[in-house]
Curated annotation (Swiss-Prot):
GO cellular component, one term: cytoplasm
Primary gene name: LipL1
Domain of life of the organism encoding this protein: Eukaryota
Signal peptide: none
Residue range covered by the transit peptide: 1-18
Disulfide-bond pairs as recorded: none
PANTHER family noted in UniProt: LIPOATE-PROTEIN LIGASE (PTHR12561), LIPOYLTRANSFERASE 1, MITOCHONDRIAL (PTHR12561:SF3)
Pfam family, one: Lip_prot_lig_C
Name of the protein this chain belongs to: Lipoate--protein ligase 1
Catalytically driven reaction(s): L-lysyl-[lipoyl-carrier protein] + (R)-lipoate + ATP = N(6)-[(R)-lipoyl]-L-lysyl-[lipoyl-carrier protein] + AMP + diphosphate + H(+); (R)-dihydrolipoate + L-lysyl-[lipoyl-carrier protein] + ATP = N(6)-[(R)-dihydrolipoyl]-L-lysyl-[lipoyl-carrier protein] + AMP + diphosphate + H(+); (R)-dihydrolipoate + ATP + H(+) = N(6)-[(R)-dihydrolipoyl]-5'-AMP + diphosphate; N(6)-[(R)-dihydrolipoyl]-5'-AMP + L-lysyl-[lipoyl-carrier protein] = N(6)-[(R)-dihydrolipoyl]-L-lysyl-[lipoyl-carrier protein] + AMP + 2 H(+)
Predominant place of localization: mitochondrion
Regulation of its function: Inhibited by the lipoate analog 8-bromo-octanoate (BrO). Catalytic activity is increased in the presence of Mg(2+).
Amino acid sequence: MKRIFRLVRRCHYSTEKRTNGPLVLVSNNQNIHFNLSLENFLLNNYNDLLKYLNINTIEKFNEPILFLWRNNRSIIIGKNQNIWSECNLKNIKEDGVLVARRFTGGGAVYHDLGNVCFTFLNNNINTSSNFLIILNTLKNHFNIEAKTQGRNDITVNDQKCSGSAFKKIKDVFLHHGTILINLEKNILNKYLTPDKIKYIKHGVSSVNARTINLSEINNNITCENLCIALIKEFTKFYEQNYKENINNIKNLENNINNSNFQNKEQININNTNENNLINNTNIIPNDITVHYIDQNNNITKNPEFLKYYNLLKDWDWCYGKTPKFQNHIWKQFTFGKLELFFNVSNGFIKDGNIFSDCLDINLIDHLKSIFNNDIKYSKEDISIFFKKLNVENKNYLDEVRSWILQEL
């Protein structure tokens, strides 16, 4: 893509600027570790976000956020996945593809400059509203009839064009995902080696067969005009409270290509690709609250951001150690695959781990507690352990309990 998406402006910080209302944030960096760190920082500092954006206010923030970003070639795996079985690490290393383990659940995905990443943040569970914004974007601006499928996918003609994952911290909800525009689908199988059992039930043989680029449906769609459309629909969705945004957002297309921004390296991030999704511009009207963030922003100098960034780059976090365990069981459930490794020492369950692409990371975290609570390797004690677990998805827990007890 040769065109440069110039969407955001420098914010002029003053008490006169409107500080309430939905925010649109865009990352001017294409490094996966940078963007995941930024996303996690926004999630954990949601209520204090205005001060980190240098807006002169004492208000606590509690409005919807749309965060748009894009990455160079990267493999991103779910928090609880086994990277050794999900990825072809030899090919990944040879081609210089970055690998990251995100902070949310779900499966392994491939990113490049042919897809747009979105993040919705809110203090309410608004997944249905978020999906509606995306569906309206595709229908109203590109004449693409898409639909939700399951809990986390958007499909066109029964092929997946978007996948999502979710996370909650305190009273803040995160919904993030990707939208495939012109992804290099032909190399998905080069880097990803997902369990074939996922595709047997779909009657297909590869990741490629299940996914579709939106450019295959409408060849006029690009990452840049999709983002403009998303901002329009996001603002339109909340127009009852913020009508002034709609009156001014029409100026976006006319002013997109007016200026450039030259990035400067600050924290040793390789972001030299010229095909930037966004560049700084001063042309968006002041009453549209859009902020750009790059590696020169104050947020990226914050110790908490740097902690996330260094963690994501850490080998132990990303790859982890998968020792040879005495016991290995796995099963594909409707909510995801579970793979358990554990040792039994002196009749007790020890030294284990659970790998999963399940979106409910709280369920997996609770299940992992079996490895550090001196649980006897017996049906009775394991059954008692499961009864004490306090999780939201009781049905999922019952399925896992029945399976493990059957495997003993």
